[in-house]
Each structure stands twice: as structure tokens, then as C-alpha cells.
Amino acid sequence: MLRVGSYVPRNASGGKTQEGNNTLQATAGKLRIVARAEWRLGEEAGDPWEGAKAGRWLGEGGSAIVRAGLRAWKESGVEEVNGRGVGIIGVGRGGEWPGWLEETSVREVVEKWRDKSPLWLLEVLPNLPVAQLAVEIGARGPVETLRERDGIEGDVEKRIQRWGKRGGKWVVSVRLTSTGAKAEVWGCEGEK
């Protein structure tokens, strides 16, 4: 263990003495990709999430994110890991309203509400598939969901490396694609 102490003098901005100790893992360092996987929409063979009840409200794209992440996690060969040492970063398009909701009045929405299950609300939450993946693999580290934009790959890699420097052992990065989802497991080879 590497112990880091910090002290901010009394005349620093804020006017308070701020002391704190931060304990970092001595093994903290650069994480590398140790496994990659993909899940295509409509794929059925080798489903790592077969029979899961949670998949019914995630929608096709959300389920693809969870399945790609689970497949990559399995292929990484990680056996036992402290859940706090595992983080998840997801990249997606964000939630979209269902087609039946477009161009309808408030009255029509209320009337259709009785016919349609309110579980569709869960499908429009962009962070739900990433949170579900964290539950499935037992990750208790940071769970982040980012919106797709130009330059997002660099931002994701910076976040992964920052997590590695703070003592994180594993990060599962998942991304929604036009054909399904892709996932990468970042970690230290020696930690398996």
C-alpha cells in the first residue's frame, strides 16, 4: 500500500486547513484490453443471459448491451474479484420514446396507459442496461453511462485509465452499435 497525505495551508482559498489521507493500491496502473465480445441483434446461439426475466423490459438494444458485456466478462477469464474493484462504462444513444406515444394527445396517452404496461418507461432509461450488467457480474465500482458523440472513444479510455490509477482492477466498457452491442474488458492480466 502506498499512503499519500495532503495538506492545504490555512491561507489557501477557502481559508480552512484541509488535511486528508488517501490510500492507493501499490499495484494501481495502466489497464489493458483483456477480452472483447459482441452481441448481434437477433442472435440466439450461446446466449450468456438465457432465461433472464430482466431482459423483457430492457428492449432489444438494452438486452444486447447486457449480453455483450456478459460474454466479454466470461471470455476474460476473471474468476473471483472484489466487486468494488470492477467498474462499468456504457455508451449509448439515450432513451427514446415508444412509437405509439408520438403524435398523441395527453388524453390518448392516458387511455393507452391502461392497455400498455408502464414497463416501457424502464426501456427509455439510458442507464438501465449498464446498471443491469453491473448487477449481473457483481460490479460495485463506478457505473457510468455516456451519450454517443464525436470523440467519445478517447473520453472512455481516459475514464478507464483514471479508474485504474485509483486502484480499480477491472472495467467493462459496453457500447451500443447499429447491429447490436460491443464490449471490452479492461484489466491487469496478472489479476485473473
Describe each region flagged by the PLM:
Residues M1-K192:
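Conserved "HGTGT" condensation-loop signature of ketosynthase/thiolase-family condensing enzymes
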